Amino acid sequence: SETPLNKFEEVYKKIIENMRTPENKKVPALAIILEEWLLKMEEIICEVNDIDPIDDEEIFLAEMEKRIEMELTDLGKVSSNFANAIRTYYKAKTVGDNVTAQAVLAWLKGEKISLSLKKTMNVAVNLERSNAILFIKAINMLLKSAGYSGLVIIMDELETVRNYVKKSSRDEAYENLRYFIDEADGNGFENCFFLYSGTTELMETERGFKSLEPLYQRIKVDKEDKFRNLRQPVIYLKEFNNSK
């Protein structure tokens, strides 16, 4: 379904909702990634310390807690709330508290949870515009920590932004796109690949990218250039004909 690009928080929710792994293409990936992340931590602990999680349970749990804290240090610098939620998820899974674990998953998906659950998780806020970008960066860091190469985000049919009734909404959407481009260019989304698709009208009409000059300056290319540079920000695709 269409994602309102003018709302960062909705973009994040759609990313989480549609995120998949190569091995589980039909199942939402968030819970899978968290479990794989914990499993990787366990494997590291057992290998480095040469211990058995059952026979040496007390030592194993102590080492796991140290490892979790070490892994969450960098994540906490991006979003302390996100790191606290992951920490709570681990503790809940350790003691079999499925209610809290599911609450963490709901919060990470961008769903609103009760104040009491937020206190349990030690998170101050729910997902909102001001923290959505940090959440996108945090989930990308978690993916890397879990052993994935990174995150691919595909935003299709960007031309729908042209149909937004309010000019302010279109401007917000294009400004958000400009922000994504600048952050990616400045390595703000390390190991994250963005692919956008849209029509020629999106590039060339006044309700399209031209309406926000800073964005248009970043992505405009010579459509008639016969040499196709795959490193340029926009690549025009040839239209299909009957033979194709």
Language-model features: locations:
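P-loop NTPase nucleotide-binding core
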Residues: 1-146
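The catalytic "switch" region of P-loop NTPases
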Residues: 101-244
